[in-house]
Amino acid sequence: MAGPAAAFRRLGALSGAAALGFASYGAHGAQFPDAYGKELFDKANKHHFLHSLALLGVPHCRKPLWAGLLLASGTTLFCTSFYYQALSGDPSIQTLAPAGGTLLLLGWLALAL
C-alpha cells in the first residue's frame, strides 16, 4: 500500500486522534455560549469520528485518490463550520456545512466504486 492510499490511511488515523482530542476538550474544557453550542459541537465530533474511520477504508477502494480527497475535504468543511459556531457562537461560516456534507456524500459514493 503506497502512494495516496497510504497517505489517506495515515490521515484517517491522525483525524481520529484529533477527533478524540476534540471530544476530550468538549467534555472537560470547552465553554459553550449556550446549549445549542454543545449540541453542535457533539454533532461535529460524531461526524469527525465517523469520517475518520471512513478515511481508513480509502486504501481498499478502486479510486482512493477521489474517495480520499472528497472525504477529507468534506470532513474539514462540515466539521470545522460546526466546531467554530459551537465554540464562538458566530454562525458566519455555517454555509460551509452543506458544501462539506455534499462532498462527504460524494466521498461515500466514491468508496463504493
Curated annotation (Swiss-Prot):
Family: Belongs to the TMEM256 family.
Alphabetic keyword roster: Acetylation, Membrane, Signal, Transmembrane, Transmembrane helix
Disulphide bonds in the chain: none
Ranges per topology, Cytoplasmic: 85-92
N6-acetyllysine modified-residue sites: 43
Transmembrane regions: 64-84, 93-113
Annotated membrane topology: Multi-pass membrane protein
Superkingdom, natural source: Eukaryota
Gene that this sequence comes from: TMEM256
Signal sequence, start to end: 1-29
Localization (cell): Membrane
Extracellular side: 30-63
CC per GO annotation: extracellular exosome; membrane; mitochondrion
Protein name from the UniProt record: Transmembrane protein 256
